[in-house]
C-alpha cells in the first residue's frame, strides 16, 4: 500500500530554509514514508506514547533532523520538522 504524504506549511518553511544538501536528505526521507511510515527494524521511526488516543510517530533523519507525523488511513501528515537539538528542547521526555 502506498501512502500520500502531506507536509504542514511550517514544516515546508523549515525544510526550505536548509542548505541544498540538507533539504535533499530531508525530502528523500519524507518521500520514503510513502512506502512504509510504520516503525520497523531500522530504528529510524518510532511510535511515541504521549497519551491515550494520540498516535504520533517520530522519524530521525540523518542524525541531524527529526520529523513528527501522524498516520490516518492512507495519508501521512508531517506536522513538524526540526533539528534534533530543537526536538530535544521541545519534547524533553520523549
Regions found by a protein language model. Give the residues of each.
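Enriched for short, Lys/Arg-rich terminal
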Residues: 13, 24, 61-94
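Generic surface-pattern signal
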Residues: 20, 31, 35-38, 92-93
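Extreme N-terminus of proteins, especially the signal/transit-peptide cleavage junction
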Residues: 1-3, 53, 94
Amino acid at each position: 500500500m502506498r501512502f500520500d504524504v502531506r507536509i504542514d506549511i511550517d514544516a515546508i518553511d523549515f525544510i526550505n530554509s536548509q542548505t541544498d544538501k540538507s533539504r535533499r536528505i530531508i525530502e528523500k526521507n519524507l518521500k520514503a514514508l510513502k512506502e512504509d511510515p510504520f516503525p520497523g527494524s531500522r530504528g529510524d521511526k518510532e511510535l511515541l506514547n504521549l497519551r491515550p488516543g494520540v498516535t504520533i510517530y517520530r522519524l530521525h533523519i540523518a542524525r541531524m533532523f527529526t520529523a513528527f507525523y501522524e498516520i490516518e488511513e492512507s495519508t501521512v501528515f508531517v506536522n513538524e520538522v526540526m533539528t534534533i537539538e530543537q526536538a530535544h528542547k521541545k519534547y524533553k521526555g520523549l
